């Protein structure tokens, strides 16, 4: 069985380190575990980079910078990160090249793969949820109940201004996630309880 973990980085951040611990544990069990990232900093031969040349790296960096321009049409009192995942990437092509039996999603933000592209993965999928982004609009954490009740005009956080970006992103997830079967694994009981309440999962 060949497993492919998808995440933005193999080193930076707690989510990346957790992904690599899982990967290395599987290798210790003689399971064919592989990792695909945008930011490869280790020399692990089982870790592949989606940015293998100057052009791919430039496009990846440009998409991240472009996504940050949301500040010009959306603002929120929620101090946690908001991620878009709306720009197409080369990840589906890279997945086909590696040809795994199972996909394990981890922290896939920074425009690593788009919401729509996730729905086009045609292999059994596990999603190891590191935060609330998969069940929300663009938020990585929220106190709002919109992820349970749906993102409506009347229940928008009064601390948000401008275009309702979270509603638009949530609508994209409803469209593309609902018919894309996957097994959900949460890193904590708290997150698991949140996910069980989610409209999306």
Where do the language-model regions lie?
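Short hydrophobic segments within beta-strands
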Residues: 6, 36, 128, 185-187
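A conserved catalytic-core segment of Leloir-type glycosyltransferases
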Residues: 28-29, 34-99
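Short beta->alpha connector loops
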Residues: 9-11, 107-111, 190
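Short N-terminal targeting/anchoring amphipathic segment
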Residues: 92-112, 123-130
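Membrane-proximal helix-turn-helix segments that form the acceptor-binding/catalytic region
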Residues: 93, 120, 133, 145-184, ...
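Short aromatic-enriched loop/helix-cap "lid" or pocket-rim segments at secondary-structure transitions
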Residues: 17-18, 44-50, 117, 137-142, ...
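N-terminal subdomain of nucleotide-sugar transferases
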Residues: 1-51, 98, 121-123
């Amino acid at each position: 069985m060949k497993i492919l973990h998808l995440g933005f980085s193999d080193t930076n951040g707690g989510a990346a380190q957790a992904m690599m611990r899982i990967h290395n544990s599987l290798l210790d069990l003689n399971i064919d575990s592989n990792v695909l990232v945008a930011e490869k900093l280790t020399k692990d031969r089982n870790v592949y980079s989606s940015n293998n040349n100057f052009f791919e790296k430039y496009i990846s960096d440009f998409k991240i910078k472009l996504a940050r321009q949301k500040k010009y049409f959306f603002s929120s009192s929620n101090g946690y990160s908001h991620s878009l995942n709306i720009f197409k990437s080369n990840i589906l092509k890279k997945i086909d090249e590696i040809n795994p039996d199972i996909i394990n999603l981890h922290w896939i933000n920074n425009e690593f793969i788009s919401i729509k592209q996730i729905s086009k993965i045609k292999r059994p999928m596990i999603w190891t949820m590191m935060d609330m982004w998969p069940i929300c609009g663009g938020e990585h954490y929220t106190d709002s109940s919109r992820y349970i009740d749906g993102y409506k005009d009347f229940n928008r956080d009064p601390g948000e201004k401008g275009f309702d970006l979270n509603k638009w992103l949530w609508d994209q997830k409803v469209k593309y996630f609902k018919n894309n079967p996957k097994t959900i694994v949460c890193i904590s009981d708290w997150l698991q309880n949140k996910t069980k309440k989610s409209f999306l999962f």
